[in-house]
Design a protein with these regions (language model features):
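Donor nucleotide-sugar binding/catalytic pocket of nucleotide-sugar-dependent glycosyltransferases
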Residues: 95-144
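Extended catalytic core of nucleotide-activated donor transferases of GT-like folds
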Residues: 21-109, 234
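Short hydrophobic beta-strand element within catalytic cores of glycosyltransferases
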Residues: 269-272, 283, 289-301
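Aromatic "clamp/platform" in nucleotide-sugar-dependent glycosyltransferases that forms part
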Residues: 252
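C-terminal amphipathic helix plus adjacent low-complexity
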Residues: 194, 305-402
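Conserved donor-binding/catalytic core segment of Leloir-type glycosyltransferases
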Residues: 149-167, 173-176, 188-190
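Nucleotide-activated donor-binding/catalytic signature segment of Leloir-type glycosyltransferases, i.e.
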Residues: 199-240, 245-246, 294
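A short alpha->beta transition loop at the rim of the catalytic pocket in nucleotide-sugar-dependent
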Residues: 243-245, 267-269, 274
Length: 402
C-alpha cells in the first residue's frame, strides 16, 4: 500500500510466501485483483530472466535472503526481550531492517552474543550491525458492519487472541470468571482460532473452552466463542457494538498488537499487559509547557513480572530459551476488569481521547510516507534516477513499431 502511493518511482512486483498453517484469505475487491495482477506480472518477469533492484522481504528474519543488490527486511519483530543469533545473522545481511514498534527495535539492539572469529580465534561481541528503525501500522478505519452476535448480556468484554502459549488467553478467561461468576449480565467474547478458520478448528476451540470452563467451576456469567474469518469492517462492527464495553488482553508480549490497535482507533477501552509493542499506541505523547514530552498511559495497565519464557513456548531460532517475556498478575487483571465494569464512563471518555490521537498520529498517509522515506534512504540516487524496468521495456516495444 505504501509503495502504491508512489508508483511514479516504484515498479512493484509481488511474490507470496506461506506462513505456517494459516489459510490463504481471498476476497473479490480492487486490492486483491491488483495483487493477482502483480503476481502474474512477477511470474512473467522471472520467467523472462528479469532481475530486481530492491527486495522488500516481509517475514520472519530467518527466512530473509539476498535476493537483490539492495535488501530490506520487514518484520513485526519478537514478543520477548531478546532475538536469536540466527535473526541477528539474517539482519546483518540486509541493507536495512524495518520493524513495527519501539519494543521490537530494543529487542534487536539490546541482544549481544559472545562469539569467536573462526579464522583468528579471537573473541568478540556479535550484535546488530545493519540500520534499523520502526514504523507503526496505519489506522485503517472502515465503516463498521453490524454483526449478529446474539448477545444475551448487556456488558461484554472481548478478547482477540489465537489459542497458544503467548496470548495467554486462559488467564483472561480465569480472571473474568472469578470476577463475575455470580453476575449473569456480564459476558466475555473470545475471538479466536487454533491455526485455521475451518469447522474442525472451530470444534477444537469449543472443546478446549469447555474443558477450561469446567475447570473454573459453576458460573452465571456468559462466555461466547466467535470463530472464523471476519473482514476489517466486521471487526469494526465487533469493536463498536454497543454491548461490547472493553477489550482485554493478558498477552505475554506483542511485537505490535494489531487487535489492541484496532480497538484503540475504534474508541474501545483497552485493558492490557503494561509491557511490549502495544505501549507505542496505548500511551499518548503529550507536550508539556516546558516543551518536554510526557508519556500518558491511556489504557487499563495490567501489572506484570518479567521472567524467562516457559519450556513449551520455545520455538527454535525464534523464541529462544534465554529470552524473557511478561507474566501478567491475575489480581491486576481482575482489578482492571472490575474497575471498567463499575466506572465504564471514565474509561470510555479516555478511550475517545486516545482514539482521536491515534487516528491522527497513525494516519495512513503519514505512515506510508515514512515507509517510502525509509526505503529511499538506502536506495542510491543513481538507481532512483534511472527509468524503471517496465518503462524501459515499453520504450523498446515502441521503438520496434517505429
Amino acid at each position: 500500500r505504501a509503495l502504491k502511493t508512489r508508483e511514479d518511482i516504484f515498479d512493484i512486483y509481488v511474490q507470496p510466501i506461506p506462513w505456517g498453517k494459516t489459510s490463504w484469505l481471498w476476497k473479490d475487491d480492487d486490492e486483491r485483483r491488483n495483487i493477482d495482477f502483480l503476481l502474474a506480472k512477477t511470474i512473467a518477469h522471472i520467467d523472462s530472466g528479469g532481475k530486481f533492484d530492491v527486495s522488500l522481504q516481509v517475514t520472519i528474519p530467518n527466512e530473509w535472503e539476498k535476493l537483490a543488490p539492495i535488501n530490506i527486511g520487514i518484520t513485526a519483530g519478537i514478543e520477548s526481550d531478546k532475538v536469536s543469533a540466527k535473526w541477528l545473522e539474517s539482519c546483518n545481511m540486509m541493507s536495512k531492517v524495518l520493524t513495527i514498534s519501539e519494543h521490537s527495535v530494543k529487542s534487536f539492539t539490546d541482544t549481544i552474543y559472545d562469539a569467536i572469529n573462526n579464522q583468528t580465534g579471537e573473541k568478540f561481541k556479535y550484535c546488530l550491525q545493519s540500520p534499523i528503525e520502526y514504523i507503526s501500522y496505519p489506522a485503517l478505519k472502515h465503516e463498521p458492519v453490524n454483526l449478529d452476535l446474539d448477545l444475551t448480556t448487556d456488558f461484554n468484554f472481548v478478547t482477540v487472541a489465537q489459542m497458544g502459549p503467548r496470548k495467554n488467553f486462559e488467564m483472561t478467561v480465569k480472571a473474568f470468571v472469578e470476577s463475575f461468576k455470580d453476575d449473569e449480565s456480564v459476558g466475555l467474547i473470545i475471538k479466536t482460532n487454533i491455526g485455521k478458520n475451518s469447522l474442525i478448528d472451530r470444534e477444537n476451540c469449543k472443546n478446549s473452552l469447555k474443558v477450561l470452563s469446567r475447570s473454573l467451576g459453576d458460573r452465571k456469567c456468559k462466555i461466547y466463542l466467535l470463530h472464523g474469518a471476519l473482514t476489517e469492517a466486521e471487526m469494526g462492527g465487533l469493536y463498536t457494538n454497543k454491548k461490547v464495553k472493553a477489550l482485554v488482553s493478558t498477552t505475554h508480549g506483542e511485537g505490535f498488537g494489531l487487535p489492541l490497535f484496532e480497538a484503540a482507533y475504534y474508541g474501545l477501552p483497552v485493558l492490557a499487559t503494561d509491557w511490549s509493542g502495544h505501549l507505542d499506541f496505548l500511551c499518548k505523547k503529550v507536550k508539556q509547557k516546558n516543551n518536554k514530552t510526557k508519556i500518558k498511559p491511556m489504557f487499563g495497565k495490567i501489572s506484570y513480572k518479567l521472567a524467562e519464557i516457559p519450556e513449551h513456548a520455545i520455538w527454535e531460532n525464534i523464541l529462544i530459551k534465554e529470552s524473557k517475556w511478561a507474566y501478567p498478575e491475575l489480581s491486576s487483571v481482575k482489578n482492571n476488569m472490575l474497575k471498567v465494569f463499575k466506572d465504564h464512563g471514565r474509561f470510555k471518555k479516555r478511550a475517545k481521547e486516545l482514539q482521536n490521537w491515534v487516528c491522527k498520529e497513525f494516519a495512513e498517509d503519514k505512515i506510508y510516507d515514512k515507509y517510502v522515506k525509509a526505503m529511499l534512504d538506502v536506495i542510491p540516487d543513481d538507481l532512483m534516477s534511472s527509468s524503471p524496468t517496465w518503462l524501459n521495456e515499453i520504450e523498446d516495444i515502441i521503438k520496434e513499431y517505429e
